[in-house]
């Protein structure tokens, strides 16, 4: 019988099948193989004894939080209160993309901007769209509802960015108040935190920490450049160009010619050297 692990507490694994939820245990062979079942794992279970027999190959695996097989991550990014931070956004995009997860940028609190601020932010919003990212603002939530059906979705962003508002728009029946996400999805405010998937109208949500908790690993730094969609790596003189100070670098040329947003490039350099 096939299923997906939606909760892990101690050595007990809650597996959602097509028919029901089953409380399962893991075979010792996984420990001997150095393999630990994770929330999000697609598994084969012994229908009679409720043991996990096999863990299917993972499409991705995050270390913090410990979760596997995320399809999409909604990056809820505030434009005001708290103010927009391009570095936090770009760092999250890199982290998500490098883990084979599709990022969707959700710009929140657009309605709080002045006309002058909207002009400035429209340029930035359109830039991200034009280089190939899926982008929505807080007047377009209905666009993603159908797209998310059946997917495992992470929801992340700064504190106060508007995650509750986003969930309310996607699933109005939740009627969330600010900071009530965990409670409404089934997790009490004062319970021990653990990663868990919640089925909300056919969308599996995983509650994740904010931007600061998702850090880049040192070994990933060589691949950071591939997460910047607009970087033309093939145009550089050297195949292993890092786009920092090499001669014949097409990316540096594109920045100087304003084909690449300078703030994006500066954020890239900061991530590479930090």
Segment roles from a protein language model:
Residues 1-9:
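Structural detector for short beta-strands of small beta-barrel domains
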Residues 13-17, 24, 45, 52:
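SH3/SH3-like beta-barrel fold
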Residues 21-37:
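Beta-strand/loop nucleic-acid-binding surfaces
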Residues 77-86:
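Short, glycine-rich nucleotide/cofactor-binding loops
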Residues 112-161:
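Canonical P-loop GTPase G-domain recognition
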């Amino acid at each position: 019988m096939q299923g997906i692990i939606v909760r892990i507490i101690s050595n007990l694994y809650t597996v959602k099948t097509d028919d029901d939820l089953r409380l399962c245990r893991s075979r010792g062979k996984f420990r001997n193989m150095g393999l630990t079942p994770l929330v999000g794992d697609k598994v084969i279970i012994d229908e009679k004894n409720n043991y996990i027999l096999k863990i299917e190959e993972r499409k991705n695996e995050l270390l913090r939080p410990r979760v596997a097989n995320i399809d999409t991550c909604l990056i809820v990014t505030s434009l005001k209160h708290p103010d927009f931070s391009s570095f936090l956004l770009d760092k999250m995009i890199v982290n998500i993309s490098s883990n084979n997860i599709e990022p969707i940028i959700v710009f929140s609190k657009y309605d709080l901007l002045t006309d002058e601020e909207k002009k400035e932010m429209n340029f930035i919003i359109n830039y991200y769209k034009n280089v190939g990212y899926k982008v929505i603002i807080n007047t377009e939530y209905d666009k993603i509802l159908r797209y998310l059906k059946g997917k495992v979705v992470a929801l992340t962003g700064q504190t106060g960015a508007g995650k509750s508002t986003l969930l309310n728009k996607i699933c109005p029946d939740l009627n969330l108040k600010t900071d009530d996400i965990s409670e409404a999805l089934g997790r009490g405010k004062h319970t021990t935190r653990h990663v868990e998937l919640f089925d909300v109208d056919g969308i599996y949500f995983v509650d994740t920490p904010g931007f600061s908790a998702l850090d880049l690993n040192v070994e990933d730094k060589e691949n950071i450049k591939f997460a910047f969609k607009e970087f033309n790596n093939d145009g550089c003189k050297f195949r292993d160009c890092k786009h920092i100070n090499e001669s014949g670098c097409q990316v540096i040329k594109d920045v100087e010619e304003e084909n690449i947003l300078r703030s994006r490039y500066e954020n890239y350099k900061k991530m590479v050297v930090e």
